[in-house]
From Swiss-Prot:
Chain ranges passing through the membrane: none
Highest taxon above the source species: Archaea
Residue sites binding [4Fe-4S] cluster per the record: C36, C172, C175, C181
Lineage: Archaea, Methanobacteriati, Methanobacteriota, Stenosarchaea group, Halobacteria
GO molecular function annotations of the record: 4 iron, 4 sulfur cluster binding; exonuclease activity; metal ion binding
Protein name, per record: CRISPR-associated exonuclease Cas4
Entry keyword set: 4Fe-4S, Antiviral defense, Exonuclease, Hydrolase, Iron, Iron-sulfur, Manganese, Metal-binding, Nuclease, Plasmid
Native source organism of the sequence: Haloferax volcanii (strain ATCC 29605 / DSM 3757 / JCM 8879 / NBRC 14742 / NCIMB 2012 / VKM B-1768 / DS2)
Length: 183
């Protein structure tokens, strides 16, 4: 089966209510794929982190207290939580732009998912309220190819029997999985 077929099969499984995908991909999985593939593997294999840590609580607080009156939250297919602005754009809120590509890819995945699975075309806004920064995000031919490459990558990583090779990254020291990697 070619890699294109993997994405097509994923889309078919998602669109057909009588089928479900082998791997129900979430936005967080897409983000982890672009941050650290080991982190993705751990999370996808049931090795989850403590959601009460300071960094996660800070992110939750920024998300919950920003743009409150101009957006509504929706849960799509019991796994993808979207915020829709009054303008109709999909919004993703992050504390910092330090990991901009993973955040952007997460939002692009949401836009791709809406278009491919639900035939809904939307544009996006990536917001960093603590930095007073916003970026428009559009799903086009190039970004669609990036998302589909990411979907292939996520399916590959999650399907492995063991985590990907250890790779030292600048943010390993603040990663909640660091004890699993560096003990």
């Amino acid at each position: 089966m070619s890699s294109t077929d993997v994405v097509e099969e994923y889309v078919q499984d998602e669109r057909d209510p009588s089928r479900s995908p082998n791997v129900p991909i979430t936005g967080l999985m897409v983000q982890y794929y672009h941050v650290c593939k080991r982190e993705l593997w751990f999370m996808a294999n049931g090795i989850d982190i403590d959601r009460e840590t300071t960094n996660i609580q800070r992110g939750t607080h920024v998300d919950e207290t920003s743009y409150g009156t101009s957006r509504r939250s929706f849960m799509i297919d019991n796994r993808i939580q979207l915020d829709i602005l009054d303008s109709g754009d999909v919004m993703e809120v992050k504390v910092s732009s330090a990991l901009e590509k993973p955040a952007r890819m997460q939002l692009l995945f949401y836009l791709w998912y809406l278009r491919e699975i639900h035939d809904i075309d939307k544009d996006g806004v990536l917001a960093y309220p603590t930095e007073r920064k916003r970026e428009s995000v559009v799903l086009d031919e190039t970004t669609t190819a990036e998302v589909e490459s990411t979907v292939r990558g996520v399916l590959d990583v999650v399907g492995r029997d063991s985590p990907p090779q250890l790779e030292k990254k600048p943010y390993c020291g603040t990663c909640l999985y660091q004890d699993l990697c560096w003990m």
